């Protein structure tokens, strides 16, 4: 059966009940409902297909249920039937993040895809705020990392691991990939309501020695190049 036939079966309360039972009792690692603590409050709707009520955007599945006048499980099935939504599952808590940061071998990265605000309709806020958040929250606010260690985990440590020996350090002979920021002002401001907002407190960014952010303004230059080991 195809997608349309499957979606049609979701109108059957018996099918919904069976799917719910399987999800609640299956311990497989691909079960994201378990990853979020089996709580629809931990699943945030970030965008929706054309046939979906736009009021559910930026709400959890539980919050969407309140808007739609139903319970969370039926809201989930109703949203799938209406065309689907994109979600952000909150599968890690702060304690788990602190445990990871306590390990000296842990690097800091993000899997967000690079996007151009002038040509892209949407993005994940981590594309614009992941690294500034490390400094504003885990260095300045929580004190979980020193500034030097945070920078190391986001630059030289990753460069060494990837075998990029001429990058990641500020030293004679190194490629000038540099970022100048105010450690007291840098912070992420992007969120799911407005994901493509540049972080604050970053004044200059140099790629291969060329300023791509110049006094806080994006420059119309393309000095980057493909790196091959």
Where are these regions (language model features)?
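Acidic, glycine-enriched loop/beta-strand segments at the rims
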Residues: 87-97, 142-151, 159-196
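A short, hydrophobic/aromatic-rich structural module that often spans a beta strand
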Residues: 161, 227-229
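Generic recognition of well-ordered alpha-helical segments
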Residues: 134-137, 157, 201, 208
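C-terminal cap of metal-dependent C-N hydrolases
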Residues: 99-105, 110-111, 123, 130, ...
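Active-site neighborhoods of metal-dependent hydrolases
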Residues: 1-143
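Flexible loop/turn segments at secondary-structure boundaries
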Residues: 82-86, 114-118, 158-161, 187-189, ...
């Amino acid at each position: 059966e195809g997608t349309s036939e499957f979606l049609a079966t979701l109108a059957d309360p018996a099918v919904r009940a069976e799917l719910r039972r399987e999800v609640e009792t299956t311990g497989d690692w691909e079960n994201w409902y378990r990853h979020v603590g089996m709580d629809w409050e931990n699943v945030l709707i970030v965008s929706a297909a054309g046939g979906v009520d736009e009021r559910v955007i930026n709400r959890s599945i539980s919050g969407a249920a309140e808007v739609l006048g139903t319970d969370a499980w039926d809201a989930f099935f109703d949203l799938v039937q209406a065309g689907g939504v994109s979600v952000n599952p909150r599968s890690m808590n702060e304690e788990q993040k602190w445990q990871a940061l306590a390990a000296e071998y842990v690097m800091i990265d993000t899997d967000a895809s690079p996007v151009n605000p002038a040509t892209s309709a949407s993005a994940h806020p981590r594309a614009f705020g992941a690294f500034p958040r490390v400094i504003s929250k885990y260095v300045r606010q929580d004190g979980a990392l020193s500034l030097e260690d945070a920078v190391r985990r986001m630059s030289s440590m990753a460069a060494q691991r990837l075998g990029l020996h001429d990058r990641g350090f500020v030293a004679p002979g190194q490629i000038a990939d540099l970022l100048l920021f105010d450690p007291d002002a840098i912070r992420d401001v992007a969120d799911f309501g407005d994901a493509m907002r540049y972080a604050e407190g970053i004044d200059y960014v140099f790629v291969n020695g060329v300023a791509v952010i110049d006094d806080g303004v994006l420059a119309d230059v393309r000095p980057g190049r493909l790196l091959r080991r």
